[in-house]
Amino acid sequence: MTKLATTGLSLIRLLGYLTVTAAALPLQALSLACGWRGVSRQLPRLYHRLVCRVLGLRVAVYGRVSTARPTLFVSNHASYIDIEVLGALITGSFVAKSEVKSWPVFGLLAQLQRTVFVERRMRSSTAQQRDSLAGRLQDGDSLILFPEGTSNDGNRLRPFKSALFSAAEIRIDGHALAVQPVTVAYVRLNGTPIGRHMRPYFAWYGDMALADHLWNLAGLGVTEIMVEFHEPVTVEALGSRKRLAEHCENVIADALARANSGRGIEAPVVDAAAVAA
């Protein structure tokens, strides 16, 4: 990657990020300890919105967020920034691989947002994954799932793992669970389209060092991110969780390809400044 980040901006933004995080951590811990369910559900969304502002992330939203509660949101995954963006738009908890729980700072943040940690490497854990997710969904909590199982380079999707859709087979109060595909795409930096050569500034994958990546990202200007909420579906309508996974993968892949090619989105903008820098 060529050097685009500025040291001064990186320093200011990361200090802002640390300040917001230091303020939010004890408040969220207190709300969980005291059983303030409404606060513990809404505070993470406020936190993520503030982080987006601090880091210069401007989000344009297309489509409408599912109003069914709970909803299982499924999204492509290119970066830890996806969590800030989706967390700012959706009241819910994330589903993450178990290793995240032990990460410094980010592991604590994930636990305080009541993230559901799953072991994705063991085939025998499918039933346990379903039970863990089903329990939270039955309790009324919407969940945000990255069915690729890991982050990618932001240019294309990895195959979706149908086993991760097992929780979609449960019924909530006698009704099929709503599953909403969501596409996240990093489209412009300071008004300039983000091409393949610039996407590594935003996508975090493989063996990239987290600290270096975050420092560089914080030093960039205003990043425009497109989030498209597609039409919710159910496993019953599609016949099986495998077909559900294929449907979500195809819908998200098509939208990501359009966004990355600069062809834009056909749906009208619902909130072009849902998270403004």
Identify the residue ranges that each predicted region occupies.
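Catalytic core of membrane glycerolipid acyltransferases/transacylases, capturing the structured
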Residues: 24-39, 45, 52-54, 69-123, ...
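Soluble extracytoplasmic domains of inner/organellar membrane proteins
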Residues: 126, 133-134, 141-160
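Short histidine/acidic/glycine/proline-rich micro-motifs that form metal-
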Residues: 34-35, 123-124, 150-153, 234-235
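N-terminal membrane-anchoring alpha-helices
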Residues: 1-60, 259, 273-277
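A cross-family acyltransferase "interaction/gating" segment
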Residues: 106-107, 154-239, 262, 266
